[in-house]
Amino acid sequence: TMALYTQDEIKFLQNFQAIVGLRYIYHETFKNRFTPKLSLMYSPGAFNFRATYSSGFRAPSLEELYYNKEKNGTLSAGNINLKPEKSNYYAINGEFMSRLFSISATAYINNLDNLITSKQVALTETDIANSITKRMEYQNVDKARVKGVDISINSYLGYGISLGGSYSFADAKDTNTDSRLPRSIKHSGSINSNWNKVWGFYTLNVNLA
């Protein structure tokens, strides 16, 4: 596999910026693929607003294609018939940044063709003979869509102390069946705090998450 990537940053008018990128991927099995990226940003004062589009391509890994692994009676099996995964990602983002406070929110849609995922399938006679109780196999999901929102907040409280948190919502579905994708997480979040102290040439940093 070989990949080449080029990117250019273009500033135009006042407070406007564009980032244009193009990746070329050559894979000895799945041949050539171009994946473009375009991001537009408008920055009035302490605010940034972005709109982004990017195309993605992921070839199946060797593990997903060929390897069989067994652990505690569960067999994870490769699949030589896997197709490469392709995606089209669209996002809008807004953020505010100051010395003491920042907040960022992103809404996105990711449309995927041939999403590679692991699904439970029926046991074979060989599995049963080898005391396998569960068989998982890598398969392609023909059409999938992930719609989500990411929010993060950070604040500086003084005396070297900062506090932050994040929340993510992701609705991941097989669009052909309208069923949730296996092992997808719909809600997630985190809270973290940080204390930073500088003594001359030395810095002490303590982080709790």
Residue ranges of model-derived segments:
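Outer-membrane beta-barrel translocator domains and adjoining extracellular loop/strand segments
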Residues: 1, 30-36, 63-68, 75-77, ...
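Outer-membrane beta-barrel signature, preferentially recognizing the C-terminal barrel domain
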Residues: 48, 55-112, 122-156, 183-187
